[in-house]
Amino acid sequence: MIHVLKSRSTLLTASSIVRTSVGSSSRYSQTRTYSRTHSWSKDASGGAISVLPTKLPFGEQAPRFPHTLGLPLVSRPLFPGLVTSVTLTDEATIDAMEALTKNQDQAYVSCFLRKKNPTGVSEGGVILATPEVITDPSDIYHVGTFAQIQRLTRGDETAATLILLAHRRLDLEYVDKIGPPIDVTVKHWNRSDYTGADDTIRALSNEIISTIREVAQVNMLFRENLQYFPMRVDANDPFRLADFAASISASGTPEDLQAVLEEKDAEMRLHKALVLLNREREVSKLQQEISQKVEERMTEAQRKYFLTEQLKSIKKELGMERDDKDTLIEKYRKTLSEYPHVPEEAMETIDAELEKFSTLEKNSPEYNVTRSYLDWLTSVPWGVETEENFDIQKARKTLDRDHYGLDDVKDTILEFIAIGKLRGSVQGKILCLSGPPGTGKTSIAKSVADALGRQFFRFSVGGLSDVSEIKGHRRTYIGAMPGKLIQCLKATGTTNPVVLIDEIDKLGTGFRGDPASALLEVLDPGQNSTFRDYFLDVPVDISKVLFICTANELERIPGPLLDRMEVIRLSGYDLPEKVAIAEQYLVPKSMRDSGLLGVPETLKLTIDAVRSLARWYAREAGVRNLAKYIDRITRKLALQVVAESEGATLTDKSSRKSNTWEITEDNLHEYVGKPVFTSDRLYEDGPLPHGIVMGLAYTSMGGSALYIETQSIRRGLDSEGKTRGGGTLKVTGQLGDVMKESTQIASTVARARLSDIKPESNFFDINDIHMHVPEGATPKDGPSAGVTMVTSMLSLALDRPIRNDLAMTGEVSLTGKVLAVGGIKEKIMGARRAGIKCVILPAANKRDYDEIPDYLKEDLEVHYADTFDKVYEVAFSSVDST
């Protein structure tokens, strides 16, 4: 137990047992007075060494200093009679130990085991991470060892090695000073303190000696220590024997070893040491078993290798088997002989690599690299082409079988086949299918391959930012391999497949290069006949490949890349087309996938139900969501069929009858829930409010209605009754830069037009105008709402509403010209969905309107405008002034 000395000159805290005495420096002069001058010799490594005489008092003859320096130890305590080395890294501690070595009579320290290793605890901005630094006396155990400094070696300026000889145990009574190093007051143990029964001690001693010898048979460390056992430890001294046994135990934990050190009873000390030895014996046996198993496996592997090599040599002598390299070289040459035409440059490279490969040893680092290179060179189908289908009627049937509509794509493919039939050969082509999601861009590519009789390969470049995915890795890199184009030729086994490059508008860029620029060579008919992959580094002809790219937004494709493609725009499907697609493709496929084709029940999804699905649940341009809703319906039907079937089985199998389930417009909500959409129109009945006009928008999801709302706020008056300042324009609705510019142009055109219609009006001078485009969470941009904005402002300024069944689109110039816009078909489809009867289009878009199917034009009044005067005439003609 450690006592805390209380005196008038001592400061005590609850967490410390540190004693400091005023005027007591002379009492501790042997440990506190250090000198930096010392004579040193050199060891073999060049470090400075301080050596004390070897003939010094040992054990009980060693002095008993009550006040010494304290030295913390890590991992293992120091047992009496043993020698250990301690590495010091704290400069103050090294200086203190160096001072002690000056006087051999004072070269003693008290060693205590730390309870835990230092982990770099920060205190006051200083990292306390060295083992010899103690900041809290409770960090060390209070039973330690009185040790003599035998030797101190300085390796460099920051570290030193201390050799210690342990003499006896001691108790820590006080910590006089927190260092580093610490000053401690100790109480030495006496031999008279030990007790124990002679017979029991003798039995335990014999068992320890027997266990040590048993462990030494399998443990080399024990065997080496046992050689010095007779000289170092008296077998009749149970205390030294227990200390020796504990000190050579490698499996003992610091707590277990400290327990042996603290034990005063000889019998208990021997017993605890024996427990450590028994644990060491079990660990040694386990290590021996593991070592034997590993050795047996290695011996067996070596034996198999030796026999295998002998067998290979015998077979080779008898001509029964050839060397692996010879077999591979023969396989490569046989593969090359089967190709119709290998380019001269490629053949020269292959011959050179085969010659190098024949000289390489199997264990050479170059062996696998060369073999991989030859594997890829011989895997390219040099000159191999798939025989194509030139039957126009068969190709048309294949395309019509898989897809409804898409006439532009089908006609282009049929033209491609016709040219090939006339020429007798087919060159490659680069098509780009652009349109909203779910319109069949990806799936039509597979149908094109089937119609042509070609192999099909698809890879997506969405988010791709590494050029190596296109052009391969250079062979200097570990794990290098060719790019997707060469992988495509190997996978299809032909040089004229149909290759689908999906999501080309979503190419990324990064520090590994620009994939869009890498595709310029791939998609250029004038260059791709000698495409050179970084890995192969030989020209490969990919000019006969039919490339089909897909994109949602052409604006995101770089101009030079887009210029190399033949763009085919796929507009969204209108309501009749969606119903036809669902009836001919989606419903039968969903029934088949749900296992409902062979059931005795009658299942029916009415046309009205499909129409309601397309109108109120899946209004996007494609049919992907429509297919999801149909799948949801068939899954619920499958559950009902199985439930009915199991119910009939439980009652009477013979009583089961065919049931009829009919999905109609009335019970559709029971299967798919409430409608997602209600109406495209914000204002249903009657004339529109002043300042409200419906425009038409075109997005990646198709066409839709786009309202423009304008409201005026009267400006305040000054003291003379005049309006302060001029009118301002505020726009909201998350508009893009182009659309914001359109609002400024529309404001100017509206002001100019108002001055012509009503010269006396000062509406825009005395009012602030706020223009808003509803659905503010949706970003909007583009110039096609120009005429709609001008009409909205004039409706507000003239205090006249416009027709409720009118929608318009067109860009307006500063002089009032109405300019052409895109997406006419999609906008007409959006207008019909919103119930619009009258549409104003730019005159330049008349040719686009003429190409729209006739059923979309039915009951639709269309006006063409080349200037805003025509727009004004149509918009306000049938509405009386209010």
Swiss-Prot record:
Residues 68-281 form the Lon N-terminal domain. GO terms for cellular component: mitochondrial matrix. Residues 687-878 form the Lon proteolytic domain. The active site is at 784, 827. Its EC number is 3.4.21.53. It is an enzyme of class 3 (hydrolase). SUPFAM superfamilies: P-loop containing nucleoside triphosphate hydrolases, PUA domain-like, Ribosomal protein S5 domain 2-like. ATP-dependent serine protease that mediates the selective degradation of misfolded, unassembled or oxidatively damaged polypeptides as well as certain short-lived regulatory proteins in the mitochondrial matrix. May also have a chaperone function in the assembly of inner membrane protein complexes. Participates in the regulation of mitochondrial gene expression and in the maintenance of the integrity of the mitochondrial genome. Binds to mitochondrial DNA in a site-specific manner. This is Lon protease homolog, mitochondrial. It comes from Phaeodactylum tricornutum (strain CCAP 1055/1).
